[in-house]
Regions:
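A structural microfeature
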Residues: 63, 131-132, 205-206, 279
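Acyl-donor-binding surface of acyltransferase catalytic domains
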Residues: 69-148, 282-286
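Conserved acetyl-CoA-binding loop-helix of GNAT-fold acetyltransferases
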Residues: 83-97, 223-228, 232-249, 267-272
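Flexible, substrate/cofactor-facing loop regions flanked by secondary structure
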Residues: 34-37, 143-219
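Short glycine/proline-centered loop/turn elements that form peptide/ligand docking sites
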Residues: 180, 240, 263-266, 285-288
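Conserved donor-binding loop and adjoining core beta-sheet/short helix segment
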Residues: 23-99, 208-219, 227
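Conserved hydrophobic beta-strand within the GNAT/NAT acetyltransferase core sheet
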Residues: 108-110, 221, 255-259
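A short beta-loop-alpha structural element at the N-terminal edge
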Residues: 1-18, 150-163
């Protein structure tokens, strides 16, 4: 059967999110998660739909891609399609040809799960290994300790607090209250929570959003940040522990997060919160035009 590349539109986002939820397993390498779409949803449903690509055969979605930036597609496939030769070749062709609407000409990047056949074919097509990332995982079968600081679960009336901590953590003015509400209106946020940590003076010092993929499946931290005025006091560790506890309450089997190798502080923070490093994953890039 022919493999069909599609832009699902707003009405098709539920099917893409559902596929990503289904594909999350403890055995799979870190991959595109419904929470990644959920976090992108801060730009609105229409923008999220415009950034999603699906590949289907005989009516079944086999792969989902998220254009997390104009030059970056984050891609994963159904577990039983990881080694599907026809699918992998179609993915490579579609990502190589700008007119197909996946990636533009010039320098572009692909994120794909370690071990997926599409990675092998990209390297055969003269794509290159690029930025290394460190995935980390925390098992949630055992009770999670108290984080040692006050934690607030943020609802709509307190969105301004979550947004302010994010802006102060990442130096980005874009995450406004309005963006929080757009994110919270998205399909994936039904299984998500926003948490804020406070210090002894009741200052909001760190924040995280956690995304469940359903009971018994891996959950995701995306994003986590510590207010620039309150770093160096262990609040990143505390909010990461609180994130693990929240995912445990949501029924997640484990908590996952991924950060660039170059962000050694973040890696150390997650490790101090009980996360264990997984084998690094390399992005893949193309410098030629097609």
């Amino acid at each position: 059967m022919t493999i069909v590349l599609s832009k699902p539109g707003v009405d098709g986002l539920s099917e893409a999110v559902g596929a990503l939820r289904e594909w999350q397993t403890d055995e799979a390498p870190l991959q595109l998660h419904p929470g990644d779409l959920g976090w992108f949803w801060r730009a609105g449903a229409e923008a999220t739909a415009a950034a999603v690509r699906t590949w289907s055969r005989d009516g079944r979605i086999l792969a989902v891609g998220l254009l997390d930036a104009p030059d970056l597609v984050r891609l994963t496939t159904a577990p039983d399609a990881q080694q599907d030769e026809e699918l992998a070749r179609q993915l490579v062709e579609d990502m190589a040809e700008p007119e197909r609407g996946v990636l533009p000409a010039g320098k572009v990047y692909v994120e794909a799960p370690t071990g997926a056949r599409v990675r092998d074919l990209l390297f055969e097509a003269r794509w290159n290994a690029d930025e290394p990332w460190t995935p980390l995982r925390r098992d949630l079968t055992e009770p999670v300790k108290n984080p040692g600081v006050r934690i607030e679960v943020i609802g709509p009336e307190r969105a301004h607090v979550r947004a302010a901590v994010h802006r102060a953590s990442f130096g980005s003015p874009k995450f406004t209250d309005r963006r929080w509400h757009m994110m919270a209106a998205g399909l994936a946020y039904a299984d998500a929570r926003c948490l804020v940590a406070y210090d002894d003076q009741d200052n909001a010092v760190a924040a995280v959003t956690v995304w469940s993929a359903g009971p018994g499946k891996p959950g995701l931290l995306e994003p986590m940040g510590v207010h620039q005025d309150h770093r160096g006091h262990g609040y990143g560790t505390a909010i990461s522990v609180a994130a693990a506890a929240a995912l445990q309450q949501l029924g997640s089997s484990c908590a996952l997060v991924c950060t660039p190798n170059s962000n050694v502080g973040a890696v150390a923070t997650y490790e101090s919160a009980g996360f264990q490093r997984l084998p690094q994953r390399l992005d893949i890039s193309r410098c030629f035009s097609g």
